[in-house]
Amino acid sequence: MEEEVAALVIDNGSGMCKAGFAGDDAPRAVFPSIVGRPRHQGVMVGMGQKDSYVGDEAQSKRGILTLKYPIEHGIVTNWDDMEKIWHHTFYNELRVAPEEHPVLLTEAPLNPKANREKMTQIMFETFNAPAFYVSIQAVLSLYASGRTTGIVMDSGDGVTHTVPIYEGFSLPHAILRLDLAGRDLTDCLIKNLTERGYSFTTTAEREIVRDIKEKLCYVALDFEQEMQTAAQSSALEKSYELPDGQVITIGNERFRAPEALFQPAFLGLESAGIHETTYNSIYKCDLDIRRDLYGNVVLSGGTTMFPGIADRMQKELTSLSPSSMKVKIVAPPERKYSVWIGGSILASLSTFQNLWCSKQEYDESGPGIVHRKCF
């Protein structure tokens, strides 16, 4: 491996794909993880209609397309579409030849072994990567925060995980997964807005609601209190202009949707909220390391970007934990991209260069090599 070839770092999330070069401080390309196919037969010859669109292009033509997400709940479910996304990443977004750069991909905690092998196979056989590595998302977020011990509460668009990490190793027995994340909150907001008389049904309209969520929603420190405030005055109301110029007003929906993170019953789910899940995850760890975990609760992922979430998390976790424990919530401002940033740090370390899984090793041992090299 010569020094000058930068590794490519690709963080494939359920909602967004983040890609760029190792050593950079932010991803060059961030685009939706979607593949769209035309709903209707094209009538105008020579319009150059493609049979599929990826990312932003699919997003901008969403009115005429059926959109599919190849990654559900953090795990790849549709490999053909996933290949399209990777192809788009290399050739259209980063404009690089994948056969010239080592590739670092990220995976969800507890990703099935077969998936990991399939990823490896596609990178080496379809894209001819010279070297490859796959790393667990939460571990990278922790690296990005400059720690080697802590518990990461990583919540993206499709899935939320709590991952305790001690001295750089994740503790699989204590990892908890919660199928409640950004996409569900968008659904929750759609439901709340429908009660107000605004209807959003198509995949395209759903993207509008996602934007409303990202711009206007926040987490209340005290939900009941906030509901009373909202009922008594219009101070919490905000307006939002839809693409067609219509203006809608949104009040208590602003904090009712994100509240589902702490009270999943709002979505009809029987699971524990993110605060309880974090607590349960810590509780599954050895007594001796719990203090270190409580003192380093790192938030990561786009769904942790709601204003007020860190304070609320601090409050809820403090009330669950033993009184002698000092709870510290770490919410880095760049946490939306901290998985990618961690990958960028890792792939550019000189000590990491001999950990890559090379094409030669793959040719000798097959996809199973990934379990021996990447852990």
UniProtKB/Swiss-Prot annotation:
Protein name: Actin-2
Subcellular location: Cytoplasm, Cytoskeleton
Gene Ontology MF, one: hydrolase activity
Record has Nucleotide-binding as a keyword: yes
Keywords: ATP-binding, Cytoplasm, Cytoskeleton, Hydrolase, Nucleotide-binding
Functional description taken from the UniProt entry: Actins are highly conserved proteins that are involved in various types of cell motility and are ubiquitously expressed in all eukaryotic cells.
UniProt-listed PANTHER family: ACTIN
Name of the gene this protein is made from: ACT2
EC number: 3.6.4.-
Cellular-component GO terms for this entry: cytoplasm; cytoskeleton
Family affiliation: Belongs to the actin family.
Gene3D superfamilies (alphabetical): 3.30.420.40, Actin, Chain A, domain 4
InterPro entries per the UniProt record, alphabetical: Actin (IPR004000), Actin/actin-like_CS (IPR020902), Actin_CS (IPR004001), ATPase_NBD (IPR043129)
Reaction it catalyzes: ATP + H2O = ADP + phosphate + H(+)
